[in-house]
């Protein structure tokens, strides 16, 4: 039944979205493959942060450049995503490390199921928790970066003689409006 629903979804996406819908499905498949590869690399003992950085870059490239083409807007969005994710990576790692997140919570650790778990893993659960949080935020960051860079690009096209500080203020206002709209 799930396969049938998935096929119906794909058909509807292609019928409604046309070429863009097909490109979105291909990008989704590429992102799923990238995440699957990252999980496999985590499992075989590859460095979690390097795999996370590589997966983040690859997912960003697939989402931005494959779906939207290579132009000044997508390169600006990619740079914004890279900078934002580096800052978020450090902040998320600090919060996860200080809070002791990762692994089993108190309820799971007290349950009987824990007796059947293999506790001899060579994987740092706080690092995996950081990787999961970072990769989970990536889609929202990409969406916001592309929205703001496209809007600022349009402002610059319609007002070519706008001063840089006004353009930055415009971008900040657009970003605030977009965050407010997205979280209401």
Ranges and model annotations:
Residues 71, 155-165:
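Juxtamembrane helix-boundary/capping and inter-helix hinge elements in multi-pass membrane proteins
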Residues 1-34:
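Membrane-anchoring/interfacial helices and their immediately flanking loops
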Residues 23-106:
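Transmembrane alpha-helical segments that form the functional core of multipass membrane systems
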Residues 121-140:
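Hydrophobic alpha-helical transmembrane segments
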Residues 139-155:
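Short helical (or helix-break) motifs at transmembrane helix termini and adjacent helical loops
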Residues 164-176:
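Helix-loop junctions and hydrophobic alpha-helical segments within the transmembrane domains
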Residues 182-184:
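Conserved small/polar residues in nucleotide/adenosyl-binding loops
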Residues 82, 174-180:
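Selective transmembrane-helix segments that form parts of the transport pathway or gating/packing helices
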